[in-house]
């Protein structure tokens, strides 16, 4: 019997300034990354059907910590600090970028990266840097073109094709899809993608349950 993931049960565990302050490097983590105005918090809230799981802020760049959420046993979502906000001091920007790079390159339990980009301003330099880091670490990437409702259907498809073509040049496992927190566009596909990334942890969970049942 397969284990179904109920994303609405996702809850906050802890915040950390860098990789050294995170809990033990075990289980499976899926990280969400994006520019400060990419709609990351709204996307996480829509994914989990919770209004305030990830705090949305009127001031981009407020999220300076790595935030860890538990989805189910052995499965976690990591909300990485938003990047690329112009009004943040350079020293802080550099610190964030170092933390992001360190996390993507050294965290063993990281098994997937979701990079969110405003569909009207995709593939900025830092977005591409995040993807490069993930590919170097052999981590699959799901690019979400957010705020897709802001474009009409034709323009949306054209932008999607353009970004998919660019994504092919990275090599590695990079998928690109559209997403709208407002309209719910792409939410089911995102859940399905996370299901596949979390599957090994769930398989272990099932084995443990079956083992304990047979022991009884």
From Swiss-Prot:
This is Probable GTP-binding protein EngB. NCBIfam families: GTPase_YsxC (TIGR03598). PROSITE patterns: G_ENGB. Residues 26-200 form the EngB-type G domain. CDD domains: YihA_EngB. It comes from the Bacteria. One of its GO terms (molecular function) is metal ion binding. InterPro entries: G_ENGB_dom (IPR030393), GTP-bd (IPR006073), GTP-bd_ribosome_bio_YsxC (IPR019987), P-loop_NTPase (IPR027417). Necessary for normal cell division and for the maintenance of normal septation. Belongs to the TRAFAC class TrmE-Era-EngA-EngB-Septin-like GTPase superfamily. EngB GTPase family. Mg(2+) binds at residues 41, 63. One of its GO terms (biological process) is division septum assembly. GTP binds at residues 34-41, 61-65, 79-82, 146-149, 179-181. GO terms for cellular component: cytosol. Keywords: Cell cycle, Cell division, GTP-binding, Magnesium, Metal-binding, Nucleotide-binding, Septation. The keyword Nucleotide-binding applies. Its cofactor is Mg(2+).
């Amino acid at each position: 019997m397969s284990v179904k993931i109920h994303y609405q049960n996702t809850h906050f565990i802890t915040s950390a300034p860098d990789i050294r302050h995170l809990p033990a490097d075990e289980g499976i983590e899926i990280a969400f990354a994006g520019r400060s105005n990419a709609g990351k918090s709204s996307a996480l809230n829509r994914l989990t059907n919770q209004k305030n799981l990830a705090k949305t802020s009127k001031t981009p760049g407020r999220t300076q910590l790595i935030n860890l959420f538990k989805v189910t046993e052995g499965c976690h979502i990591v909300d990485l600090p938003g990047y690329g906000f112009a009004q943040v001091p350079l020293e802080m920007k550099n610190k964030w970028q170092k933390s992001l790079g360190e996390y993507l390159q050294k965290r063993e339990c990281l098994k997937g990266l979701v990079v969110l980009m405003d569909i009207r301003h995709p593939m900025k330099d830092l977005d591409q840097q995040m993807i490069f880091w993930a590919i170097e670490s052999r981590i699959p990437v799901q690019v979400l073109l957010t705020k897709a409702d802001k474009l009409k259907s034709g323009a949306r498809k054209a932008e999607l094709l353009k970004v998919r073509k660019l994504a092919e040049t990275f090599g590695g496992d990079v998928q690109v899809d559209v997403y709208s927190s407002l309209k719910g566009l792409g939410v089911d596909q995102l859940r399905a993608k996370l299901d596949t990334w979390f599957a090994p942890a769930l398989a272990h969970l099932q084995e443990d349950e079956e083992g304990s049942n047979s022991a009884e």
